[in-house]
Design a protein with these regions (language model features):
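Gly/Ser/Thr-rich loops at beta-strand to alpha-helix junctions
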Residues: 109-112
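Conserved phosphate- and dinucleotide-binding cores of soluble alpha/beta proteins
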Residues: 2-30, 37, 52, 85, ...
Protein backbone atom coordinates (compact mmCIF):
# COMPACT_ATOMS: atom_id res chain seq x y z
CA UNK A 1 0.00 0.00 0.00
CA UNK A 2 2.78 2.42 0.97
CA UNK A 3 4.58 1.63 -2.28
CA UNK A 4 1.44 2.40 -4.28
CA UNK A 5 1.00 5.75 -2.51
CA UNK A 6 4.65 6.65 -3.11
CA UNK A 7 4.28 5.74 -6.77
CA UNK A 8 1.14 7.88 -7.06
CA UNK A 9 2.96 10.87 -5.56
CA UNK A 10 5.85 10.34 -7.97
CA UNK A 11 3.50 10.20 -10.95
CA UNK A 12 1.77 13.42 -9.85
CA UNK A 13 5.10 15.15 -9.34
CA UNK A 14 6.37 14.09 -12.74
CA UNK A 15 3.18 15.30 -14.39
CA UNK A 16 3.71 18.64 -12.66
CA UNK A 17 7.30 18.74 -13.91
CA UNK A 18 6.04 18.32 -17.47
CA UNK A 19 3.63 21.22 -16.86
CA UNK A 20 6.61 23.31 -15.77
CA UNK A 21 8.32 22.49 -19.06
CA UNK A 22 5.22 23.56 -20.96
CA UNK A 23 5.74 27.07 -19.60
CA UNK A 24 9.55 27.19 -19.69
CA UNK A 25 12.23 25.94 -22.04
CA UNK A 26 14.03 24.19 -19.20
CA UNK A 27 13.86 23.12 -15.57
CA UNK A 28 16.62 22.66 -13.00
CA UNK A 29 17.08 19.96 -10.34
CA UNK A 30 17.28 22.60 -7.60
CA UNK A 31 14.02 24.16 -8.81
CA UNK A 32 12.22 20.80 -8.67
CA UNK A 33 13.60 20.01 -5.23
CA UNK A 34 12.46 23.35 -3.85
CA UNK A 35 9.04 23.32 -5.54
CA UNK A 36 8.06 19.83 -4.38
CA UNK A 37 10.04 19.59 -1.16
CA UNK A 38 12.06 16.58 -2.28
CA UNK A 39 15.77 15.83 -2.30
CA UNK A 40 18.05 16.47 -5.26
CA UNK A 41 18.40 12.70 -5.64
CA UNK A 42 14.62 12.33 -6.01
CA UNK A 43 14.46 15.27 -8.43
CA UNK A 44 17.16 13.71 -10.61
CA UNK A 45 15.37 10.36 -10.51
CA UNK A 46 12.18 12.04 -11.72
CA UNK A 47 14.02 13.66 -14.63
CA UNK A 48 15.79 10.41 -15.49
CA UNK A 49 12.47 8.54 -15.55
CA UNK A 50 10.86 11.17 -17.77
CA UNK A 51 13.88 11.15 -20.09
CA UNK A 52 13.73 7.35 -20.38
CA UNK A 53 10.05 7.70 -21.29
CA UNK A 54 11.02 10.07 -24.09
CA UNK A 55 9.25 13.07 -22.56
CA UNK A 56 12.22 15.41 -22.08
CA UNK A 57 15.96 15.66 -22.65
CA UNK A 58 18.30 15.60 -19.69
CA UNK A 59 21.01 18.20 -19.32
CA UNK A 60 23.68 18.67 -16.70
CA UNK A 61 21.71 19.91 -13.71
CA UNK A 62 18.24 19.69 -15.22
CA UNK A 63 16.25 19.03 -18.38
CA UNK A 64 14.86 20.76 -21.45
CA UNK A 65 11.58 20.35 -23.27
CA UNK A 66 11.51 18.33 -26.47
CA UNK A 67 8.69 20.44 -27.87
CA UNK A 68 8.93 24.04 -26.72
CA UNK A 69 10.73 26.08 -29.35
CA UNK A 70 13.35 28.65 -28.56
CA UNK A 71 13.47 31.92 -30.47
CA UNK A 72 16.37 31.57 -32.89
CA UNK A 73 18.22 34.22 -34.87
CA UNK A 74 16.25 34.94 -38.01
CA UNK A 75 19.38 35.30 -40.13
CA UNK A 76 18.64 31.61 -40.67
CA UNK A 77 14.93 30.83 -40.31
CA UNK A 78 15.50 27.11 -40.59
CA UNK A 79 15.43 25.73 -37.06
CA UNK A 80 13.18 22.89 -38.24
CA UNK A 81 15.00 22.32 -41.54
CA UNK A 82 17.68 19.64 -41.87
CA UNK A 83 17.49 19.02 -38.11
CA UNK A 84 18.93 15.50 -38.27
CA UNK A 85 21.87 16.73 -40.36
CA UNK A 86 22.59 19.59 -37.97
CA UNK A 87 22.44 17.28 -34.97
CA UNK A 88 24.82 14.82 -36.63
CA UNK A 89 27.22 17.66 -37.44
CA UNK A 90 27.06 18.89 -33.85
CA UNK A 91 27.73 15.39 -32.51
CA UNK A 92 30.89 15.13 -34.62
CA UNK A 93 32.00 18.66 -33.79
CA UNK A 94 31.76 18.13 -30.03
CA UNK A 95 34.66 15.69 -30.37
CA UNK A 96 36.88 18.69 -31.16
CA UNK A 97 36.14 20.20 -27.74
CA UNK A 98 38.21 19.41 -24.65
CA UNK A 99 37.43 19.95 -20.99
CA UNK A 100 38.33 23.48 -19.97
CA UNK A 101 38.11 24.96 -23.47
CA UNK A 102 37.03 28.50 -24.24
CA UNK A 103 34.87 28.61 -27.36
CA UNK A 104 33.86 31.45 -29.65
CA UNK A 105 30.46 30.38 -30.94
CA UNK A 106 28.87 31.89 -34.04
CA UNK A 107 25.16 32.56 -34.59
CA UNK A 108 22.83 30.09 -36.28
CA UNK A 109 20.75 26.96 -35.87
CA UNK A 110 23.66 24.55 -36.29
CA UNK A 111 25.55 26.48 -33.62
CA UNK A 112 22.58 26.02 -31.28
CA UNK A 113 22.59 22.26 -31.87
CA UNK A 114 26.31 22.25 -31.07
CA UNK A 115 25.78 24.23 -27.87
CA UNK A 116 23.11 21.75 -26.72
CA UNK A 117 25.88 19.13 -26.40
CA UNK A 118 28.34 21.16 -24.35
CA UNK A 119 27.18 19.56 -21.11
CA UNK A 120 29.24 16.56 -22.27
CA UNK A 121 32.36 18.54 -21.30
CA UNK A 122 33.51 20.16 -18.06
CA UNK A 123 34.79 23.68 -17.48
CA UNK A 124 33.57 25.15 -20.77
CA UNK A 125 33.32 28.90 -21.41
CA UNK A 126 31.35 30.17 -24.41
CA UNK A 127 31.91 33.62 -25.89
CA UNK A 128 29.13 34.64 -28.25
CA UNK A 129 27.20 37.53 -29.78
CA UNK A 130 24.08 35.38 -30.16
CA UNK A 131 21.37 36.12 -27.59
CA UNK A 132 19.50 32.84 -28.15
CA UNK A 133 22.64 30.84 -27.45
CA UNK A 134 23.40 32.86 -24.32
CA UNK A 135 19.79 32.43 -23.13
CA UNK A 136 19.92 28.68 -23.70
CA UNK A 137 23.14 28.31 -21.72
CA UNK A 138 21.78 30.49 -18.92
CA UNK A 139 18.56 28.46 -18.64
CA UNK A 140 19.82 24.94 -19.29
CA UNK A 141 23.57 24.65 -18.69
CA UNK A 142 24.63 25.85 -15.24
CA UNK A 143 28.03 24.21 -15.66
CA UNK A 144 28.86 26.27 -18.78
CA UNK A 145 30.04 29.86 -18.39
CA UNK A 146 28.99 32.40 -21.01
CA UNK A 147 30.50 35.73 -22.03
CA UNK A 148 28.36 38.04 -24.16
CA UNK A 149 30.10 40.24 -26.68
CA UNK A 150 28.75 43.79 -26.63
CA UNK A 151 27.33 45.61 -29.62
CA UNK A 152 24.21 46.81 -31.38
CA UNK A 153 21.23 44.48 -31.59
CA UNK A 154 20.20 43.52 -35.08
CA UNK A 155 16.47 43.69 -34.53
CA UNK A 156 14.59 40.49 -35.23
CA UNK A 157 17.81 38.50 -35.45
CA UNK A 158 18.83 38.21 -31.78
CA UNK A 159 22.54 38.82 -32.25
CA UNK A 160 24.90 41.73 -31.65
CA UNK A 161 27.24 43.39 -34.13
CA UNK A 162 29.16 46.57 -34.85
CA UNK A 163 32.14 48.48 -33.43
CA UNK A 164 31.60 47.37 -29.83
CA UNK A 165 31.48 43.74 -30.92
CA UNK A 166 34.68 44.15 -32.91
CA UNK A 167 36.39 45.89 -30.01
CA UNK A 168 35.41 43.10 -27.64
CA UNK A 169 36.78 40.47 -30.02
CA UNK A 170 40.17 42.19 -29.90
CA UNK A 171 40.23 41.61 -26.14
CA UNK A 172 39.51 37.86 -26.05
CA UNK A 173 41.22 34.65 -27.13
CA UNK A 174 39.58 31.25 -27.52
CA UNK A 175 40.78 27.72 -28.04
CA UNK A 176 38.26 27.12 -30.82
CA UNK A 177 36.01 29.29 -32.98
CA UNK A 178 32.86 27.44 -34.05
CA UNK A 179 31.64 29.05 -37.28
CA UNK A 180 28.39 28.58 -39.21
CA UNK A 181 28.66 29.85 -42.80
CA UNK A 182 25.62 31.01 -44.70
CA UNK A 183 27.11 29.32 -47.74
CA UNK A 184 30.29 27.83 -49.19
CA UNK A 185 31.21 28.78 -52.75
CA UNK A 186 34.15 26.91 -54.27
CA UNK A 187 35.54 29.94 -56.07
CA UNK A 188 35.11 32.27 -53.11
CA UNK A 189 35.04 30.59 -49.71
CA UNK A 190 32.67 30.95 -46.77
CA UNK A 191 30.03 33.65 -47.07
CA UNK A 192 27.15 35.36 -45.28
CA UNK A 193 24.47 37.86 -46.31
CA UNK A 194 25.07 40.66 -43.78
CA UNK A 195 28.29 42.70 -44.09
CA UNK A 196 28.64 43.45 -40.38
CA UNK A 197 28.15 39.77 -39.60
CA UNK A 198 30.92 38.96 -42.07
CA UNK A 199 33.38 41.17 -40.20
CA UNK A 200 32.32 39.63 -36.89
CA UNK A 201 32.89 36.11 -38.21
CA UNK A 202 36.31 37.06 -39.58
CA UNK A 203 37.29 38.54 -36.22
CA UNK A 204 36.11 35.42 -34.39
CA UNK A 205 38.40 33.23 -36.47
CA UNK A 206 41.31 35.60 -35.84
CA UNK A 207 40.65 35.52 -32.08
CA UNK A 208 40.88 31.72 -31.78
CA UNK A 209 43.75 29.26 -31.81
CA UNK A 210 41.79 26.98 -34.13
CA UNK A 211 38.51 27.21 -36.02
CA UNK A 212 35.89 24.82 -37.35
CA UNK A 213 33.14 25.45 -39.91
CA UNK A 214 29.86 23.59 -39.37
CA UNK A 215 27.55 23.37 -42.37
CA UNK A 216 24.99 20.99 -43.80
CA UNK A 217 25.02 20.02 -47.46
CA UNK A 218 22.48 22.69 -48.41
CA UNK A 219 25.12 25.37 -47.84
CA UNK A 220 27.40 24.11 -50.63
CA UNK A 221 27.32 26.54 -53.55
CA UNK A 222 24.53 28.42 -51.82
CA UNK A 223 24.00 32.17 -51.89
CA UNK A 224 26.03 34.63 -49.87
CA UNK A 225 27.16 38.12 -50.80
CA UNK A 226 29.97 38.74 -48.31
CA UNK A 227 32.97 36.49 -47.86
CA UNK A 228 34.26 36.20 -44.30
CA UNK A 229 36.88 33.47 -44.78
CA UNK A 230 38.67 31.49 -47.44
CA UNK A 231 38.62 27.70 -47.30
CA UNK A 232 42.13 27.63 -45.85
CA UNK A 233 41.30 30.08 -43.05
CA UNK A 234 39.65 27.31 -41.02
CA UNK A 235 41.30 24.21 -39.60
CA UNK A 236 38.36 21.80 -39.86
CA UNK A 237 35.08 21.53 -41.75
CA UNK A 238 32.28 19.31 -40.43
CA UNK A 239 29.42 18.36 -42.76
CA UNK A 240 26.66 15.78 -42.99
CA UNK A 241 27.65 15.09 -46.61
CA UNK A 242 29.64 16.75 -49.39
CA UNK A 243 27.50 17.11 -52.56
CA UNK A 244 29.46 16.20 -55.69
CA UNK A 245 32.62 16.23 -53.53
CA UNK A 246 32.69 20.01 -53.98
CA UNK A 247 34.38 20.74 -50.66
CA UNK A 248 36.78 17.81 -50.91
CA UNK A 249 37.81 18.97 -54.39
CA UNK A 250 38.45 22.50 -53.14
CA UNK A 251 40.54 21.12 -50.29
CA UNK A 252 42.58 18.99 -52.70
CA UNK A 253 43.36 22.09 -54.75
CA UNK A 254 44.72 23.96 -51.73
CA UNK A 255 48.35 24.02 -50.63
CA UNK A 256 49.15 20.94 -48.56
CA UNK A 257 50.10 22.82 -45.40
CA UNK A 258 46.93 24.93 -45.50
CA UNK A 259 44.38 22.21 -46.18
CA UNK A 260 41.63 21.96 -43.57
CA UNK A 261 40.47 18.58 -42.35
CA UNK A 262 37.08 17.45 -43.66
CA UNK A 263 34.86 15.43 -41.33
CA UNK A 264 31.69 13.83 -42.69
CA UNK A 265 29.39 13.20 -39.74
CA UNK A 266 28.60 9.53 -39.27
CA UNK A 267 31.04 8.39 -41.95
Amino acid sequence: MAHAITRAFADERRAAIMEMLEHNASVQVAEIAQTFGVSSVTARADLDALAEAGKLRRTHGGAVSLHKRLTVSTQDRRINVNVAAKQAIAQSAIELVNDGDTLLVDSGTTALEFVRLLDQRDGITVITADITIADYIDESMPSVDVVMLGGALRKGHRYLYGPLTMQALQMVHADLAVMCPGAFVSSCGFTTDFPQMAETKTAMIAAAHQSVALMDASKVNGRGMYRFAELTDVDTIVMDRDPDHAVATSIAEATDSARPALIIAGA
